[in-house]
Swiss-Prot record:
Part of the 50S ribosomal subunit. Contacts protein L29, and trigger factor when it is bound to the ribosome. GO terms for biological process: translation. SUPFAM superfamilies: Ribosomal proteins S24e, L23 and L15e (SSF54189). It comes from the Bacteria. This is Large ribosomal subunit protein uL23. One of its GO terms (cellular component) is ribosome. Keywords: Ribonucleoprotein, Ribosomal protein, RNA-binding, rRNA-binding. One of its GO terms (molecular function) is rRNA binding. The keyword Oxidoreductase does not apply. Belongs to the universal ribosomal protein uL23 family. It comes from Campylobacter lari (strain RM2100 / D67 / ATCC BAA-1060).
Length: 93
């Protein structure tokens, strides 16, 4: 089962801020999160039922440091369409 700890952050980029005007929130999560898991977390912790969820898998970039290769962490990005007039504010605040 998915947990709130699997959500890393809500992304605030130029693209995501433009999408917020249309009621879409961009959420970065761990790679094991699923659409149904995210829907459960949003219902349980935020009291919001999303209209639509699109997911995107982002592989970690390969970076070099002092001659050695390493890889940044992979993550999933979700585009969550919320009902009109609803925002993500924690019900446990």
């Amino acid at each position: 089962m998915a947990d709130i700890t699997d959500i890393k952050t809500i992304l605030y980029t130029e693209k995501s801020l433009n999408l917020q005007e249309q009621g879409v929130v961009v959420i970065q999560t761990s790679p094991k999160m699923t659409k149904n898991g995210l829907k459960e977390v949003l219902r349980e912790y935020f009291g919001v039922t999303p209209v639509r969820i699109n997911s995107l898998k982002m592989d970690g970039k390969i970076k070099r440091f002092r001659g050695r290769e390493g890889q940044r962490n992979s993550f999933k990005k979700f585009y969550v369409k919320l009902p009109e007039g609803v925002s993500l504010e924690s019900s446990e605040a």
